A protein has these predicted regions:
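Non-catalytic, mobile gating and regulatory segments of ester bond hydrolases
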Residues: 1-177, 181-321
Length: 321
């Protein structure tokens, strides 16, 4: 009887290990977004396709940079707004407006060719963000069932966003993007804004997105949709309610392996066998280095890693002949 492990003890141990891994990764995760780089480097590449757009390595990199800029704390003071504005102007974008209500933050920007709506992701020290993430009750809509936390969070800024789009972007193509919680908000935004702006939504790019709704909801999203996943990114596996929540969009998988040219491999679709092997390899590597086995699963969610990998791929594939 001494060898029998109670289910409660297993859950308690798993929670303890997760908390330890989370604490180890938290500092890196939070500080990753403080090193905001200007966007001038993006001008070295040709302009990607804009209307009802197919997947583009260039646009994926642009959107990844836009998502990283969403982590500027522009809601805190004017200095941070100026910081965001400077970074955008360095890449020939103009800041139209920032949005902040409760736990939801986003900004709208545009250049001469297209507009971008970028949502901020989960901040580990913000209770509103955490509460949104864990509120996995599904709300029934005419288009299926959607995570009520994500839907409510988008509704907090929906009217303001629609107003700004009507006034400021005209008939411009609109790209929508986000990371983590922001990816979920971008998903909901894409579906909600299709009612009025369906002819203008060029594409939605998400990074490290959780599951957002059921299969009916997924099918209701008509805009081009690209879901980018980095190796063991743990957030892409939640909510852990398989069969009820599903992912939206055409997946692109960023591998831990590199090609001969030194760039990371990117797969179209989700190569489940390869991902399983890489997850095992990452976990074993952490154990061999005496780290918490969950650390690589959390570290892989860093937006900085997404930007680094996508930058290399975009530059390599768009080299002049």
């Amino acid at each position: 009887m001494k060898n029998i492990v109670k289910p409660g003890e297993v859950l308690k141990t798993a929670k303890k290990e997760f908390d330890q891994a989370y604490d180890q990764a938290k500092t890196k995760y939070q500080t990753a977004f403080k090193r905001i780089k200007p966007l001038a480097e993006l001008d070295t590449l040709p302009v990607p396709p804009l209307v009802r757009a197919a997947y583009s390595d260039r646009m994926a990199w642009i959107m990844a940079n836009m998502v990283q800029l969403a982590y500027v704390n522009f809601e805190e003071n004017e200095l941070e707004v100026e910081r965001l504005d400077y970074a955008l102007r360095s890449g020939a974008f103009n800041l139209i407006r920032t949005f902040s209500n409760k736990g939801t933050q986003a900004f709208l920007a545009k250049n001469d060719e297209f507009a971008v709506l970028s949502f901020r992701g989960t901040q580990p020290d913000k209770w509103e963000d955490i509460k949104t993430d864990i509120n996995a009750i599904r709300e029934k809509t005419v288009d299926g069932k959607v995570h009520i936390g994500f839907k409510t969070a988008f509704d907090d800024v929906k009217d303001l966003i629609i107003e700004e789009l009507r006034i400021n972007i005209g008939k411009m193509p609109l790209y929508i993007t986000g990371h983590s919680l922001g990816a979920a908000l971008a998903t909901v935004a894409t579906r909600e804004l299709e009612t009025e702006f369906s002819d203008q939504i060029a594409a939605c790019y998400t990074f490290g997105s959780p599951r957002v709704g059921d299969s009916k909801y997924e099918k209701s999203v008509k805009a081009p949709f690209y879901r980018i996943v980095n190796t063991t990114d743990i957030v892409t596996l939640v909510p852990f309610l398989l069969g009820t929540f599903v992912h939206v969009g055409d997946a692109r998988y960023l591998s831990r392996r590199k090609a001969e040219d030194g760039t990371y491999l990117i797969y179209r679709g989700m190569p489940n066998f390869i991902r399983t092997l890489e997850c095992i390899a990452e976990t074993l590597s952490a154990l061999l280095h005496l780290s918490n086995p969950l650390s690589p699963w959390i570290n892989a969610h860093s937006m900085e890693i997404y930007v680094e990998k996508l930058a290399g791929i975009a530059k390599q594939r768009n080299k002049p002949n």
